[in-house]
Regions:
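P-loop NTP-binding site
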Residues: 189-294
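Catalytic P-loop NTPase motifs of RecA-like helicase/translocase cores
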Residues: 41, 64-66, 99, 129-130, ...
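Canonical P-loop GTPase G-domain recognition
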Residues: 117-118, 127-189
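Conserved C-terminal guanine-recognition region of P-loop GTPase G domains, centered on the G4
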Residues: 49-55, 74-150, 221-224
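Active-site glycine-centered loops adjacent to acidic/histidine catalytic or metal-binding residues
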Residues: 60, 124, 154
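Conserved G1/Walker A P-loop phosphate-binding module
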Residues: 1-84, 88, 93, 233-235
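Conserved glycine(s) of the Walker
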Residues: 18, 160, 252
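Active-site phosphate-binding and catalytic loops of NTP-dependent enzymes
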Residues: 32-34, 101, 176-180, 203-214
Length: 294
């Protein structure tokens, strides 16, 4: 039997580069929320995959951007902390709009030089551009940094992932596996449940409102028939926000609850009874209390 190998990998990049989609594709299950809106990942999420004798632990970090608010600054600090703590960094770049973000990418790379010398460039969303555009972007990005390796992928369609995983397995050091073989994440059921509901809030509420909302799973109960009872609290900053979350005659919260329940049943592979309660609290002043579930 071959000696076990283990590698810790950070998935970093600008918001909406496809980091969460990549980690979901790698583990083969949706463990990280995905929305069209930027900065939806608030807490680093680990996804675990096995390739031969190698266990690779990916950490999906919050997007790196120019932070202004207390919450935003906390997210960016969290992202850089994850980068420092892992063996190697994958910098994910959305090739479909990289020129618009080139200065932001340069800023990340400049800091990366002082934090983590080993970096792999992963050019994502290749399904959205022509081959000539991809080739030009590949050459341009390669000039910005001395990358260990460059891969082109479509995380959404899983194109190019096998080459990336194979390479990471090759460079992984000999170490015992950190997690059990069947484990695909170290996130708790409570956290994953809250994230699912938070995703549905992002998808159903307009503009900036979802950014001012936190979700906490208060209670999970396993029944004899293997179904789950999940009770969650949605915290809104203001009473006016609470009214919008609830919607006219409770229409919004009902729709959000139905969509979240369907997603939770896919995730946990069982019947789920979901109960949502909306409360008003200025939770942003208590980030330490909420960071695991916000």
């Amino acid at each position: 039997m071959k000696k076990q190998k283990c590698l810790f990998v950070t998935i970093a990049g600008l918001p909406n580069a496809g980091k969460s989609t990549l980690i979901n594709s790698v583990v083969g299950k949706k463990i990280a929320i995905v929305t069209p809106k930027a900065q939806t990942t608030r807490t680093p999420i680990r996804g675990i995959t096995i390739y031969g004798n190698t266990q690779i632990i990916f950490t999906d970090s919050p997007g790196i951007f120019s932070a202004k608010t207390k919450l935003e600054k906390s997210l960016v600090r969290s992202a850089w902390s994850v980068i420092r703590g892992n063996d190697i960094t994958l910098l994910i770049v959305d090739i479909s709009n990289y020129l618009k973000n080139i200065e932001k990418i340069k800023t990340i790379l400049a800091r990366l030089q002082h934090v983590k010398d080993k970096c792999i460039l992963v050019i994502n969303k290749i399904d959205l551009v022509k081959k000539t555009e991809l080739k030009i972007g590949h050459v341009h990005l390669n000039l910005l940094y001395k990358f260990e390796k460059i891969f082109t992928i479509s995380a959404l369609k899983s194109d190019g992932l096998s080459d990336l995983i194979s390479y990471l397995s090759e460079i992984a050091p000999a170490n015992p596996w950190f997690y059990k073989e069947e484990q695909i994440t170290d996130s708790s059921m409570s956290f994953l449940s809250a994230e699912v509901t938070r995703e549905k809030l992002f998808l159903n509420l307009y503009k900036e409102l979802p950014y001012s909302i936190a979700v906490i799973t208060e209670h999970i109960q396993k029944n004899e028939d293997k179904s789950l009872i999940i009770k969650q609290i949605i915290f809104a900053l203001r009473h006016s926000h609470k009214k919008i979350v609830l919607g006219k005659d409770g229409g919004n919260i009902k729709k959000i609850g139905i969509e979240a329940r369907v997603e939770l049943e896919k995730l946990f592979e069982c019947k789920v009874h979901l109960f949502l309660f909306v409360k008003v609290r200025y939770w942003i002043e208590h980030l330490g209390e909420y960071m695991l579930d916000v």
